[in-house]
Amino acid sequence: MRIILLGAPGAGKGTQAQFLMNTFGIPQISTGDMLRSAIKSGSELGKKAKQVMDAGQLVSDDIIIELVKERIAEPDCQNGFLLDGFPRTIPQADAMRDNGIEIDYVLEFDVPDEIIVDRMSGRRVHPGSGRVYHVEHNPPKVEGKDDETGEDLVVRPDDQEQTVRKRLSVYHEQTEPLVEYYQKLSEEGKTEYHKIDGTQPVERVSEQLGDLLRK
């Protein structure tokens, strides 16, 4: 069961990735984790990646694809894997196919921008413990204060409305074209593409995913 998760930041992919890993016993493959462990291990690819990153450049698709190939050849990926945050662009998706990396399911989490902005800009965090609140959906007992310590809650830079909107526009520009790309492959019978309504309650989304993938 080889799965790609698509969806804007804040669409709920992380929560559902956790559910899929626990339910189906497949690992989540994060390109960030792979880069860090390759650099730590001092492998050839790791050295190449480190040089590029030290120069403040973006790591090339070629290096990332090689890392993905190495990672999915490991024993824990025998029954499948979950890719989140990769591919981000059509050239990356093409490179995956050219390298024989097959995908069974592409799951897109569809949530309107305004709901994402509301979800993320309403988050408040207690820096000491990492406890997360939401001004509407999960408010603290006292506005702006942590329930347990009474200390101030903060808005993470990533959750500020301006930042959220910027990340959404990058997603629409770079990654959204992948939706069409995988829909086309799905029509050709080369993968299964499914759009999930990410505005539903978390449990409902998990239930839908479970039903879909157990078919």
Curated annotation (Swiss-Prot):
Its EC number is 2.7.4.3. Pathway: Purine metabolism; AMP biosynthesis via salvage pathway; AMP from ADP: step 1/1. Residues 128-151, 195-215 are annotated as: Disordered. The keyword Transmembrane helix does not apply. It is found in: Cytoplasm. Residues 30-59 are annotated as: NMP. AMP binds at residues 31, 36, 57-59, 85-88, 92, 156, 167. Its main location: cytoplasm. One of its GO terms (molecular function) is adenylate kinase activity. Keywords: ATP-binding, Cytoplasm, Kinase, Nucleotide biosynthesis, Nucleotide-binding, Transferase. Residues 133-144 have a biased composition (Basic and acidic residues). Residues 122-159 are annotated as: LID. GO terms for cellular component: cytoplasm. ATP binds at residues 10-15, 123, 132-133, 200. It comes from the Bacteria. The keyword Cytoplasm applies. It catalyses: AMP + ATP = 2 ADP. PROSITE patterns: ADENYLATE_KINASE (PS00113). Consists of three domains, a large central CORE domain and two small peripheral domains, NMPbind and LID, which undergo movements during catalysis. The LID domain closes over the site of phosphoryl transfer upon ATP binding. Assembling and dissambling the active center during each catalytic cycle provides an effective means to prevent ATP hydrolysis. NCBIfam families: adk, PRK00279.1-1, PRK00279.1-2, PRK00279.1-3, PRK14527.1. Catalyzes the reversible transfer of the terminal phosphate group between ATP and AMP. Plays an important role in cellular energy homeostasis and in adenine nucleotide metabolism. Belongs to the adenylate kinase family. Monomer. HAMAP family: Adenylate_kinase_Adk (MF_00235). This is Adenylate kinase.
